[in-house]
Amino acid sequence: DSIKKNARKKFIDENLCQKLIENEKFVYLPLHQEPERSLLLAAPKFSNQLETVKEISKILPENYKLYVKEHPTQGPARNWRDIKFYKEILKLKNVRLIHPDFDSKLLFRNCELVISVGGTSSFEATFFGKPSLIFADLGYAIIPSIIKLNSYSELQQGIADCLKMKIEPRFVLKYLEILERNSFVFDILDFEASYQNKFYVNGNLVDVKFHEIDMRQFLNEHKAELDRVAKEFVRKIYQFNIIRTNETSD
């Protein structure tokens, strides 16, 4: 595995772009780390990322390139993809495959449009004043500059609509206000770090066997914060049921 991983990284370093082409218009597509919830659960119909790249490539306007960036944690967390995957993308004439270490902010800042299956990239795009297309059902899709697609057949019209779109920051601010009203304090980064340290040797292992006694110990150690999360979820369920009841009665 180590030899394979090093060979794949060598191919990435030697073949993936590490700079922007001056005055080149492009659509930005960040790849998801695989396997990942954003693909397998949120958008299973679109979990084949190579197919997504090819479908976008087919209908991209002639004066645009598609910049596809490898996920920076794909290698460290899950091993780099098979070299065949990268070669298939490199064959596409209107596609540039971007190195995982390249600064994503430069891509957000200079692109005309962001396309993402799911995840947070399309939400990030709004802070750079960029429109975006997504395939997953995500809460932030209520922002008008984010268009949800249900099939690849909607790509061409979606791209055309986004490229004509004028972004209004007030809608992003409204969404952030909604988030603030419906949020609660929970240090998820600290919780995930504790989880990784307990079960994955500080994130250095992937395929590990869980033991019941270790899980019980972990849950007991974090009982207070998990109880708080559970109460907030129950509160939200009650709120949703009240709203649904009122809508039904109307």
Predicted regions and their residues:
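A donor-sugar binding/catalytic signature common to diverse glycosyltransferases
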Residues: P100-I147
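Conserved catalytic-core segment of nucleotide-activated headgroup transferases in glycan assembly
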Residues: D1-I83
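Donor nucleotide-activated moiety binding/catalytic core segment of transferases
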Residues: L41, N48, A77-T120
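Short acidic-hydrophobic, aromatic-tinged amphipathic segments that line or gate anion-handling sites
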Residues: R96-H99, I146-G158
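Short, glycine-/Ser/Thr-/acidic-enriched flexible segments
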Residues: E34, T73, S121, G139, ...
